[in-house]
């Protein structure tokens, strides 16, 4: 029988002993499973199982307690302290199963390490300390819930730590895109759309021969694709519609007036004001001048003096007529 060991180290070991299985009849069953478990390092020599087995070896009155597992466990239930009990017997489970449910019998034994405390007038208080599995001739210790959760949390924290270390070097900052994990991809230009204009540098300017080749290729490509033709027809129809709707309107605040060569900037209300007087004035036709051309008025010095003298004569006549009245 093995002594006590650290429970944390027992979770990481597997124990098996084919020689003990051969000594116990070649296979494990309900009456020898606890004695096979007593040879493993998971067994505690200070338990009630060990003390009862020692008493049976030296006292014939206790011999019948070790002959069957039912008698052995019944004796353990009358004692108080640390004990090992079979919690699941695959042979009994297979024998007590429903005959209509056909299944293969399991070969997994479940043994519990527990403490029993007697209470007068009440049922015994049993506290489970550990659980063990016997699969074939291999014995395992079931991990505790705390160790399982701790290992899962440790695994998650380790993965997150490595992720944060990797992700801390990925972000890049640009004024146009801000913080990004991937470099910004250049925007793809759609050549088929008429509003998209390709901007080429002087270094990429093709030679004359290459230019002619590119033009021929683009011409053949435009004939094969119906997309540009549809956009061209739509643009042409929209242009005709705009001309028919707004062809007579001007966006200039001060429209030009006059003829070519003598345009004059006018205020918006000048055209309306000058329309009525021009209609009332009779149209004068001069044989010497061209139609629509303004005539320049030139006065000679001799004619100017005659006009002035003719204007002064009526004034003198009016002055003379006043005394007579």
From Swiss-Prot:
InterPro entries: Mediator_Med6, Mediator_Med6_fun, Mediator_Med6_sf. Residues 175-230, 253-325 are annotated as: Disordered. The keyword Endoplasmic reticulum does not apply. Residues 189-204, 213-227, 278-287 have a biased composition (Polar residues). It is found in: Nucleus. Signal peptide: none annotated. Residues 304-315 have a biased composition (Basic and acidic residues). Its main location: nucleus. Keywords: Activator, Nucleus, Transcription, Transcription regulation. GO terms for cellular component: core mediator complex; mediator complex. Residues 316-325 have a biased composition (Basic residues). Pfam families: Med6 (PF04934). GO terms for molecular function: transcription coactivator activity. It comes from the Eukaryota. Belongs to the Mediator complex subunit 6 family. Component of the Mediator complex. Component of the Mediator complex, a coactivator involved in the regulated transcription of nearly all RNA polymerase II-dependent genes. Mediator functions as a bridge to convey information from gene-specific regulatory proteins to the basal RNA polymerase II transcription machinery. Mediator is recruited to promoters by direct interactions with regulatory proteins and serves as a scaffold for the assembly of a functional preinitiation complex with RNA polymerase II and the general transcription factors. This is Mediator of RNA polymerase II transcription subunit 6. It comes from Emericella nidulans (strain FGSC A4 / ATCC 38163 / CBS 112.46 / NRRL 194 / M139). The lineage of its organism: Eukaryota, Fungi, Dikarya, Ascomycota, Pezizomycotina. The gene is med6.
């Amino acid at each position: 029988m093995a002594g006590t060991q650290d429970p944390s180290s027992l979770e990481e070991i597997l124990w098996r002993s084919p020689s003990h299985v051969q000594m116990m009849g070649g296979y494990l069953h309900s009456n020898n499973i606890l004695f096979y478990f007593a040879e493993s390092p998971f067994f505690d020599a200070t338990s009630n199982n060990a003390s009862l087995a020692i008493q049976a070896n030296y006292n014939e009155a206790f011999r019948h307690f070790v002959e069957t597992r039912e008698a052995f466990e019944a004796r353990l239930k009358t004692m108080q302290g640390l004990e090992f009990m079979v919690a699941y017997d695959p042979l009994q489970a297979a024998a007590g199963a429903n005959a209509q449910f056909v299944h293969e019998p399991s070969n997994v034994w479940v043994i519990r390490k527990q403490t029993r405390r007697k209470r007068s007038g009440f049922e015994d208080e049993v506290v489970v300390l550990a659980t063990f599995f016997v699969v074939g001739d291999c014995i395992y210790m079931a991990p505790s819930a705390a160790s399982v959760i701790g290992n899962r949390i440790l695994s998650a924290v380790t993965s997150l730590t490595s992720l944060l270390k990797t992700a801390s070097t990925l972000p890049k900052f640009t004024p146009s895109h801000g913080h990004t994990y991937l470099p910004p991809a250049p925007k793809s230009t759609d050549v088929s759309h008429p509003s998209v204009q390709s901007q080429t540098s002087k270094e990429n300017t093709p030679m004359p021969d290459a230019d002619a080749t590119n033009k021929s290729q683009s011409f053949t490509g435009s004939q094969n694709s119906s997309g540009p033709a549809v956009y061209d027809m739509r643009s042409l129809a929209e242009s005709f519609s705009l001309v028919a709707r707004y062809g007579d309107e001007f966006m200039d605040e001060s429209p030009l007036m006059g003829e070519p060569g003598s345009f004059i900037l006018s205020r918006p209300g000048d055209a309306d004001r000058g329309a009525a007087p021009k209609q009332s004035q009779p149209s004068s036709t001069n044989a010497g001048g061209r139609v629509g051309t303004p005539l320049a008025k030139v006065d000679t010095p001799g004619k100017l003096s005659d006009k002035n003298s003719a204007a002064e004569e009526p004034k003198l006549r009016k002055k003379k007529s006043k005394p007579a009245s």
